[in-house]
From Swiss-Prot:
InterPro entries: ATP_synth_F1_dsu/esu, ATP_synth_F1_dsu/esu_N, ATPsynth_dsu/esu_N. It comes from the Eukaryota. CDD domains: F1-ATPase_delta. It comes from Dictyota dichotoma. Produces ATP from ADP in the presence of a proton gradient across the membrane. GO terms for cellular component: chloroplast thylakoid membrane; proton-transporting ATP synthase complex. Pfam families: ATP-synt_DE_N. It is found in: Plastid, Chloroplast thylakoid membrane. This is ATP synthase epsilon chain, chloroplastic.
């Protein structure tokens, strides 16, 4: 039995496929989805969404969003995300530089300015996920 996964963004439909397994970057903890999973709605953190298709993992870098898992005759996963980024191996150095800049920005933010601190924290989290995606592809 497989999992039907659909990914959408605010600009429209992005991707649909049948998967063997899915690893979601849930806001509480990484969430592994297998066929027959219980019904659940979860928030997604910026991170690496991994989809196993034909015994190979496909990494997808996402920003925040939500996922709904519904199981009846089959397991269906609908993922709504704000942004998605294609991972290209030649951009690894750029990803490391962006992470360094995000760390620097977080260190110079006024600790009293909560909005700026949250924004800088999200940028750092996304930059860390980008570097993680490149390392994932290298293995």
């Amino acid at each position: 039995m497989s999992i039907n996964i659909r990914i959408v963004t605010p600009t429209g439909f992005l991707w649909e496929t049948k998967a063997e397994e899915i690893l979601l970057p849930s806001t509480t903890a990484p969430l592994i989805v297998l066929p027959g999973h219980i019904n659940i709605l979860t928030g997604l953190s910026p991170g690496l969404l991994r989809v196993k298709v034909d015994s190979r993992w496909k990494p997808i870098l996402i920003s925040s969003g939500a996922a709904q898992i519904l199981t009846s005759d089959s397991t269906n996963v609908d993922v709504g995300i704000m942004e998605v980024e294609e991972i290209k191996q030649e951009n690894f150095k750029e990803a490391e530089l962006l992470l360094e800049k995000a760390n620097d920005a977080l260190n110079i933010i006024n600790p009293i300015d909560i909005r700026e601190r949250i924004k800088a924290g999200e940028a750092k989290s996304f930059a860390e996920s980008r570097v993680e995606a490149f390392k994932f592809l290298a293995t």
